[in-house]
């Protein structure tokens, strides 16, 4: 322990080969960097390093700059907030060579996922502008590059994934540091540090330095006493990687229980990527069988609130899926975002309008929204797309909004609105016209009543005269009858 310099800086990799357990990242990054150095500007002028913290993203850039003799210009996301900073960085990116001779440069933009696309002035637009004008390679780092706001950066960059380091490589680095610092250490203690760091080499080195400088020795009992287990929450991609790499039940179970995904979304992620990771049909069948059984248990939990069944769900989606791999070899695969979730996101607005339409008709028809969607909506679609005139009456009567009309009528929405306007104009005629019409009708009715009354009077008078004559004849005929 010759000085007080933090070990993560003192033992930072000086060469590319010193960056351990990131071979895939090296295979993608180094050819891209060499094309810059050879004067062949690649199609994608920037590279985006993404992965969990402490796995070597920044270290690989620094090691490459040192090995290839490049001037490293390192900036954080906070440097992209003011216009003056953006202009300064733009000048650096547009300058061909360094002030210190003809030395090439490499630009490192750290933690770009911390930039707000709306709040920070410049922000992502400034980075995209730098990528367009740069004459030097630009490398960006991010822990989670899958935020929607970072999509323009993903499209403009070479995506370079970094993964959590294996326990074996972390232990090797810790052993080298202990040897260089003349620290007495136990192998089991180093393994315990590596396990609790969970692939984060930076955390492991910091833990090692804290124990070594405090006690002068690294023993198992000290590690257990001083280091609490880090309760990490895995991202979806980390969860999948850890799940499919699991060799033991506890590893698989830990992968699915240490994530912020809800139960349904967890099943969607695993279901989407089983066929991506597994290649043998029998392995795929076994994994989907376990997932289907987990879905059954989850359905029972929702219906009966029997949360005591939840451990069975985790046993099936974790060990059940992980141990289904018998014949497929593990491979580094690009996992996919669940298509069902993407479709739900794309159709969110349509589904909201559908719910609003169902609610309007359910209130007026005194039924449930489910009944409206099942029994009424199909007929509404037909009416609105076949008979715009009838649809206009329904739209006015139920006070439907423009979005509701567009949803029901589709391309005929404009015709429905034309009929609505015509109908409303007819209903909104001036009141004087109605009064005049009513007066005319009243006069006509009165005249007709007068004529009818006159005719009735004449019929009554005629009837009376006929009755009088009949009576006189009746009396005469009675006398004659008596005489005979």
Curated annotation (Swiss-Prot):
Q: Where is this region: Disordered?
A: 435-484
Q: Which GO terms describe its molecular function?
A: ATP binding; ATP hydrolysis activity; DNA clamp loader activity
Q: Where is the composition biased (Basic residues)?
A: 456-475
Q: Bias category Low complexity: which stretches?
A: 435-455
Q: Specify the domain of life of the species encoding this protein.
A: Archaea
Q: Which GO terms describe its biological process?
A: DNA replication
**InterPro entries noted in UniProt:** AAA+_ATPase (IPR003593), ATPase_AAA_core (IPR003959), P-loop_NTPase (IPR027417), Rep_factor-C_lsu (IPR023935), RFC_lid (IPR047854)
Q: Which UniProt keywords apply?
A: ATP-binding, DNA replication, Nucleotide-binding
Q: Where does ATP bind?
A: 51-58
Q: Which HAMAP family match?
A: RfcL
PANTHER family (alphabetical): CHROMOSOME TRANSMISSION FIDELITY FACTOR 18, REPLICATION FACTOR C SUBUNIT 1
Query: Could you say which protein family the record assigns here?
Result: Belongs to the activator 1 small subunits family. RfcL subfamily.
* Functional summary from the UniProt entry: Part of the RFC clamp loader complex which loads the PCNA sliding clamp onto DNA.
Subunit: Heteromultimer composed of small subunits (RfcS) and large subunits (RfcL).
Listed name of the protein: Replication factor C large subunit
Task: Name the gene that codes for it.
Answer: rfcL
């Amino acid at each position: 322990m010759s000085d007080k310099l933090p070990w993560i800086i003192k033992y930072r990799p000086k060469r590319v080969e010193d960056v351990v357990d990131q071979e895939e990242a090296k295979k993608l990054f180094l050819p891209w960097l060499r094309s810059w150095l050879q004067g062949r500007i690649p199609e994608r002028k920037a590279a985006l390093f993404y992965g969990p913290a402490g796995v070597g993203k920044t270290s690989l850039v620094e090691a490459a700059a040192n090995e290839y003799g490049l001037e490293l210009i390192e900036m954080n996301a906070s440097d992209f907030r003011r216009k003056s900073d953006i202009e300064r960085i733009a000048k650096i990116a547009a300058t061909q060579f360094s002030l210190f001779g003809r030395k090439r440069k490499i630009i490192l933009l750290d933690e770009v996922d911390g930039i707000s696309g709306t709040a920070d002035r410049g922000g992502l637009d400034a980075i995209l502008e730098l990528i367009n004008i740069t004459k030097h390679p630009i490398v960006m780092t991010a822990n989670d590059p899958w935020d929607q706001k970072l999509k323009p950066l993903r499209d403009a960059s070479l995506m370079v994934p970094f993964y959590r380091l294996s326990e074996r490589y972390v232990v090797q680095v810790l052993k080298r540091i202990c040897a260089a610092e003349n620290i007495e250490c136990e192998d089991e203690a180093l393994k315990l540090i590596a396990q609790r760091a969970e692939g984060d080499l930076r955390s492991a080195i910091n833990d090692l330095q804290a124990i070594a400088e405090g006690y002068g020795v690294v023993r198992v009992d000290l590690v257990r006493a001083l280091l609490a287990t880090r309760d990490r929450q895995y991202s979806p991609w980390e969860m999948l990687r850890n799940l499919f790499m699991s060799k033991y039940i506890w590893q698989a179970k830990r992968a699915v229980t240490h994530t912020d995904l809800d139960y349904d979304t967890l099943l969607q992620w695993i279901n989407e990527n089983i066929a991506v990771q597994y290649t043998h049909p029998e392995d795929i069948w076994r994994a989907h069988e376990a997932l289907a059984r987990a879905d059954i248990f989850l359905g029972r939990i929702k219906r009966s609130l029997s949360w005591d069944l939840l451990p069975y769900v985790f046993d099936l989606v974790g060990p059940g899926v992980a141990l289904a791999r018998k014949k497929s070899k593990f491979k580094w695969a690009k996992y996919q975002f669940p298509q069902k979730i993407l479709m739900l996101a794309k159709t969110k607005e349509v589904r909201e309008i559908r719910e609003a339409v169902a609610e309007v008709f359910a209130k007026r028809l005194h039924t449930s929204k489910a009944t409206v969607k099942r029994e009424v909506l199909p007929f509404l679609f037909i009416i609105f797309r076949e008979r715009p005139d009838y649809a206009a009456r329904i739209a006015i009567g139920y006070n439907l909004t423009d979005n509701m009309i567009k949803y029901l009528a589709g391309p005929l929405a404009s015709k429905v609105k034309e009929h609505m306007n015509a109908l409303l104009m007819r209903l909104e005629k001036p009141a004087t016209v109605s009064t005049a019409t009513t007066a005319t009708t009243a006069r006509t009715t009165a005249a007709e009543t007068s004529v009818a009354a006159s005719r009735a009077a004449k019929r009554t008078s005629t009837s009376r005269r006929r009755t009088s004559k009949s009576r006189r004849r009746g009396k005469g005929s009675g006398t004659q009858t008596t005489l005979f």
